[in-house]
Amino acid sequence: MTVRRPLLAALVLAAVTVAAYLPVLQNGFVHYDDDLYVLDVVQVRDGLTQEGVAWTFTTWQGANWFPLTRLSWMIDAELYGLEPAGFHGTSLLLHVLAALLLHAALLRLTGAALPSLVVAAVFALHPLHVESVAWVAARKDVLSGVAFMAALWAYARQLEAQRPLPWALCVFAVMALGLMAKPMLVTLPCVLLLLDWWPAGRLVDDSGRLVPRRVARAFAEKLPLFALAAAASVVTVAAQRAGGALQALERFPLAVRLETAVEALAIYTLKTFWPVRLAVFHPHPEGGIPGWRTALAVALLLAVSATAFWLRRRAPWWAVGWLWFVGMLVPVLGIVQVGEAAHAERYSYLPQTGLVLALVWGLHHWATGRPARERGAALAAGAALAALALSTAAQVRVWRDDRSLFEHALRVTRDNPVAHINLAVVLAKEGQYGEAERHLDAASVLSPGSAHAWGIRGEVRLASERPAEARDDLVRAVALEPEAVRWRLGLARAHREAGELAAATVQLRAALARDPERADLHALLGLVLADRGETEAALDALAASLRIDPSPGPLHARRAVLL
């Protein structure tokens, strides 16, 4: 193959990927973590500043530590302000770069041009990956994806170099950067060991049998990478624990977690072939997973695993690809439950490549040297890629705004309280309080332990001038999440509108004890104290509010009246 052909293949790959994802440039932000990580974070909104850079390396955010990802958002804010097209364009470019690096890495590792291109094209065009590209908050996926693919390419160079140390250091550095984007790369050393098995052939003898001495030597080479992964795991667990993201066994018992993990693994496998019912959030099934579904999932996984084991010598790509797929998914299968989702499409962003690798090389091996099969395989691959591209373009449009995203989630999932709550927020902003309340009623039934279901319904009822009903909902929200300042602020407003000024004061003082730098808390406390006739205390509270945020004109006027 000439030099020009790989370059031409890369250009075509990039062009087709951009074409499939081009609608993303018309999408806005979604207020589901985009606000948590970007829109409501002053350090990000201000762009690249010395204080912001220091902040990104020294603080948790959303139960995560991903300074490289936050720096990328800061650069976007510096370049584009808060224009969503700029943020989406950066994510798309990173995704294209990851696909090109994967193509280059596989081509260098295997020397097989067409299969390498097909694997990279599936990675670039598969609709399971839309969530990672079209969601600004998922920037950590595409950024860590670039690092992961760059590490594969650098490792391929390490294997062929006469002086491998510089390339080994490059792999270490790229992995470290990737871990600062997302801790998903903790499994990278294991993937590199699999590549030592196939296609590098470093772990086996001429018959394809694994040689323990060679395995031990390859493992020892990667001890620095395993140490880096261990350190990143410690940091990740600390961040998740500090952010309250780790779920207790009482909430999700071990048996439930294992059932969920098995079903999630089967779902990721099946959706690789038939990517339907894609949604931003997949809830745990109400009442648990039926036994027959768990049995089918176990049967599927055992069948694939047995086949890969049986073919491990004469067709090692099956075992390598399957272990890559399963191994990279293990940290996100829910055995250590983080968050509320049963599974998420974005978790398959890097693992799926292992499964696709096995399938494509299996098809390549079956067709090679048989012209009729080669033509059939080429037609099948072309048709599959075209279908994936069209499906991806359609899925990108689902992410155009909050309403589209959560209406779609409710159409393709069942009993989804998160989708009900977030769609209710959209409707409430549009003044459709009755429709919003209907969704919040459903959410409170599906998830009676959700503070958001009760608290947001209380806020909606408060906005529709029903303070007594709002108060009852917000009391439940505070009981479920007593550390949340938002619910105490809402409850204080409900108490004030109901004329319960003493109760409002209690809630505001409790909220200020948790967050003394919230201007709106001081402001409302000042107004409540003024209503109670406590002029001096009211003036102090209003002054504190204006010290933190001097902009609100009505507060200046009210303070002047009290003076």
Map each language-model feature to its residues.
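C-terminal luminal/periplasmic domains and tails of membrane-associated envelope-modifying transferases
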Residues: M1, R403-L563
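Polytopic membrane enzymes that build or remodel cell-surface glycoconjugates and lipids
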Residues: M1-E459, A463, A479, R486
